[in-house]
Amino acid sequence: LKRNLREMSFPYVESSDTFTIRATGDWYISDAPDSREWTNAYGWVHVDRLSGKGDPGTYQKVTVTCDQNTSEERSATIYLHGCGEENVAIAIRQDNGIFEWKPFDNGQQFDVSGMLKLNAEAGAKLRIPYIKALGTEKYTVTVTQTGGDGITAASGSYSISTAGNGYIEVPLTGTATKQGIVTFAVKATDEAGAEKDFGSVSTIVRAGFDAQGEELPLLTQNFGKFPWGGDCIGQKAGVTTADKTVANLSLDNETVSVSAGTNASIGGITSTVRNGNPSFYRAIGMEGWTGYLNYMCPGYMQFGAAGDNADGQPGNIISPVLNIPAGYDMLLTFKVGIWAAAPDQGMVGICEKNDGFWISKGTLSKIVASTKSYVSLDIPAYTWVEVSAVIPNPGSLANPSLFISTADSWFSGSTVKAGRWYVDDIKLVY
């Protein structure tokens, strides 16, 4: 008496799978040991046949079906008997099926999907993600709002009508009458009166568009001219220049293979390369950018290093000088990734342009404090995750620039702790 599986795993939803039996004679299936009877002991496990007569050259198929699970992960065991053998076990496991509110990979428990534009009808919505719904859930959603004059979030009753994963979507209606930051705070109460607080999310009402409605970003950088390095996030090998002499760097250089997890190994981009080969720096789309402890990867940038930096320099990048319209707030979006030991968070904001940051008593010099905020790096490894931050207008400032840096929470005295993270697709809008 042979079976092709010793264990079977099922998702939380009602689902079926098969195993095969090869036997020399009569066989039986039970749901209790030392018995050839099916007693429906578990109630949620079903088989499409309980017995059969086999021959050594024939594989007989049995289908196992598990009902939808609405509780914790559960397990069962079924037993095969016959042909001189008893209690030949097959273990069955089914995933947890309890309804969950499921945050986005960036840690937000809800988001603002769509754009809010000044003097235009709102077409955006708040999305609250969930998984493992039965399709019978009902919630009262309450939204409180700061800013966003003219826009209203539709607090009220919401029903989930389809089983599985999805979103509760709260429409935003009205016409925004003022550019600037808008913050939404969301709570939901179920039919039993239990309340869930989803925290708050901020975005901006945007005004930066031309006469045709096309957006006018203050800044973009996608590192699309970075050709070299192993792909740390995609876990793929790559190439880098065979000649790593800084003065000889050229996009026409011959290349050699490098493994995944290895950057281009040509030195710091905004330090060594910028100072040693200005023409190559322009060729890779970095003119006007400064910073420290950052490195080339294929199509994106690495911040930080594998070892502590005793000079107190965090991995960072500083944009060219920005032309920020007076009085307008901004929204920064970019992608982050991690693959090994990484800082706990990144730090962003507006600073006065300089060639790099130097730590002084645990802070970074020349930052406009009112613009500084943090983005979490508590994210899945090997995955690009979009993060965002609202940046209040910095007011009158000489040479305002955007900075993205390893956060000051990663400093230890005058040392920046070891840790690497990766940045791509930077965009700043207003």
Regions found by a protein language model. Give the residues of each.
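Solvent-exposed, low-complexity, repeat-rich "mucin-like" stalks and linkers
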Residues: 2-34, 102-141, 224, 228
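Surface-exposed binding patches on compact interaction domains or structured appendages
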Residues: 24-63, 136-162, 167
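A short beta-strand micro-motif common to beta-rich folds, especially ectodomain repeats
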Residues: 62-64, 72-84, 180-191
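Extended, low-complexity, turn-rich repeat/linker tracts enriched in Gly/Pro/Ser/Thr and Asp/Glu
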Residues: 134-136, 310, 325-328, 337-345, ...
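Extracellular carbohydrate-recognition regions
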Residues: 208-276
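Surface-exposed, low-complexity/disordered Ser/Thr/Gly/Pro/Asn-rich loops and linkers
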Residues: 257-326
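Extended extracellular/luminal ectodomain segments enriched in beta-structured repeat modules
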Residues: 314, 323-333, 397-399
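Terminal, low-complexity interaction segments
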Residues: 358-430
